[in-house]
Amino acid sequence: MKLAGLKSIENAHEDSVWAATWVPATEDRPALLLTGSLDETVKLWRPDELDLVRTNTGHSLGVAALAAHPSGIIAASSSIDSFVRVFDVDTNATIAVLEAPPSEVWGMQFEPKGTILAVAGGSSASVKLWDTASWRLISTLSIPRPDAPKPSDKTSSKKFVLSVAWSPNGKRLACGSMDGTICVFDVDRSKLLHQLEGHNMPVRSLVFSPVDPRVLFSGSDDGHVNMHDAEGKTLLGSMSGHTSWVLSVDASPDGGAIATGSSDRTVRLWDLKMRAAIQTMSNHNDQVWSVAFRPPGGTGVRAGRLASVSDDKSVSLYDYS
């Protein structure tokens, strides 16, 4: 397995690019790449040339996260303006606008069947679940705070929720916090199953293995990528190689590799059998906020693709084989 650079667009946005995700292919079009920036816009790109399809506006502050519905028809963008905008991918028509208190909208992900949008709730130490048929808030999964914190105790603020991930079967939801803990919930019962440990700094990114719903990967400011058994509450391994914060982690569709983006300005590819980094890409000259593998499917799809975005305002696309 390896990465090969295909195309990079300098100044793809007018400010730092914090988010990237792929919109799955539909019957009418191939998969598209979505990027979100502090310039308050979301852009749609057509691979492999990274041709700009459209620029979406609608936020009054920077875009912090993106999520694509598995149907490929709609997507969501969250902003530090505390709004989540749900829109039609092909027309940019607004489907819904979800409002949250300040600092309440960070990571997001649609449930694998598309029935729920999970939004990491920031300082509320919770994950909000929104029904995608009615766009109503249907549940709040709360993270336990320390008992009776003193007024001067800052521990509760460390429960700030940064990241969220669904298991492939939709039965489990994991969220990562500022204090380094990861909570795993049974979604049907709205019950906290357990907390996973292994990091001592913010967990900014989570992803489940697409081939094993028990395996969860986490990236943290401690520079490590951890591999957990999310059911057995076991740390399966810890991988290191980045020289600074791990800001993003994503799993390849074949389940054989993960990619990470870091504030050390690199993208790394990790072989999961070796549990080691096997390649480092240095396309960016500032921290890499997001990496995203293209999902499988679609007519005429060639080899695998990985995208990365950075504070340097650029977007890079790689061949994964």
Swiss-Prot record:
Keywords: Cytoplasm, Flowering, Nucleus, Repeat, Transcription, Transcription regulation, WD repeat. Pfam families: WD40. The keyword Repeat applies. GO terms for cellular component: Cdc73/Paf1 complex; Cul4-RING E3 ubiquitin ligase complex; cytosol; nucleus; plasma membrane. Gene3D superfamilies: YVTN repeat-like/Quinoprotein amine dehydrogenase (2.130.10.10). Transmembrane segments: none annotated. WD repeats lie at residues 12-55, 58-97, 100-140, 156-195, 198-238, 241-280, 283-319. One of its GO terms (biological process) is post-transcriptional gene silencing. It comes from the Eukaryota. The keyword Cytoplasm applies. It is found in: Nucleus; Cytoplasm. InterPro entries: G-protein_beta_WD-40_rep (IPR020472), SKI8 (IPR051510), WD40/YVTN_repeat-like_dom_sf (IPR015943), WD40_repeat_CS (IPR019775), WD40_repeat_dom_sf (IPR036322), WD40_rpt (IPR001680). Disruption phenotype: Early flowering, reduced plant size and defects in floral morphology in whorls 1-3, but fully fertile flowers. Growth defects due to extra shoot apical meristem (SAM) formation. Component of the PAF1 complex (PAF1C) which is involved in histone modifications such as methylation on histone H3 'Lys-4' (H3K4me3). Involved in regulation of flowering time. Required for the expression of the flowering repressor and MADS box gene FLC. Required for histone H3 trimethylation on 'Lys-4' (H3K4me3) and histone dimethylation on 'Lys-36' (H3K36me2) at the FLC locus. Prevents trimethylation on 'Lys-27' (H3K27me3) at the same locus. Not required for meiotic recombination or progression. Component of the nuclear PAF1 complex (PAF1C), which consists of VIP2/ELF7/PAF1, VIP3/SKI8/WDR61, VIP4/LEO1, VIP5/RTF1, VIP6/ELF8/CTR9 and CDC73. Component of the cytoplasmic SKI complex, which consists of SKI2, SKI3 and VIP3/SKI8. Interacts with VIP4 and VIP6. This is WD repeat-containing protein VIP3. It comes from Arabidopsis thaliana (Mouse-ear cress).
